[in-house]
């Protein structure tokens, strides 16, 4: 049984489906959760669900100073889950420089800053668990998402580099790469679109946010102390690497 009692976890993008599921599970396993996102109303709603042992931190990841402050405000930090991300999809020949830049800035650069600042804090205690949420398309690519795919592939490379740098300090750094997970976005697909995607998934169904949360919880636990620099794929077999 995973026990995170006494641990403090920071989850970005906690106002979304996957982030919320991660926050709820880590809280259930005993961790104090710092739930962060840009939508305060949704964070307050999540707070009502977990009820206690939580802190809300509204943060705009496009503001690098806010990224740094998000970490510095945590008096204690054992687990960092970088889940927040954005998309701005279009074919590369139509993609504006600013559309590429804003996705890289939030999905990759902001997460680098969060990782870096968290490591500074974790080194003091010689303990830490960092889990960066990538995506299946960071490995496979996807048409119309050159910016998003680049950012998610970058997270995987960054994670590997950081894991080397901090391995002797009791800190592990890993990535979880979800496939097609049920969300507001997938709910908007029509039946034909859903069937086309499901046909590509050997397990024959979408994943649930909780599937991703369980992978994160394992990597955040002491049971995963010998795992670092790895990418855990949660995609129903859609991509086997």
From Swiss-Prot:
InterPro entries: 3oxo_ACP_reduc, NAD(P)-bd_dom_sf, Sc_DH/Rdtase_CS, SDR, SDR_fam. Disulfide bonds: none annotated. Pathway: Lipid metabolism; fatty acid biosynthesis. Its EC number is 1.1.1.100. One of its GO terms (molecular function) is 3-oxoacyl-[acyl-carrier-protein] reductase (NADPH) activity. Pfam families: adh_short_C2. Keywords: Fatty acid biosynthesis, Fatty acid metabolism, Lipid biosynthesis, Lipid metabolism, NADP, Oxidoreductase. It catalyses: a (3R)-hydroxyacyl-[ACP] + NADP(+) = a 3-oxoacyl-[ACP] + NADPH + H(+). Substrate binds at residue 135. GO terms for biological process: fatty acid elongation. The keyword Ion transport does not apply. The active site is at 148 (proton acceptor). NADP(+) binds at residues 13-16, 38, 57-58, 83, 148-152, 181. It is an enzyme of class 1 (oxidoreductase). The keyword Lipid biosynthesis applies. Belongs to the short-chain dehydrogenases/reductases (SDR) family. Homotetramer. Catalyzes the NADPH-dependent reduction of beta-ketoacyl-ACP substrates to beta-hydroxyacyl-ACP products, the first reductive step in the elongation cycle of fatty acid biosynthesis. This is 3-oxoacyl-[acyl-carrier-protein] reductase FabG.
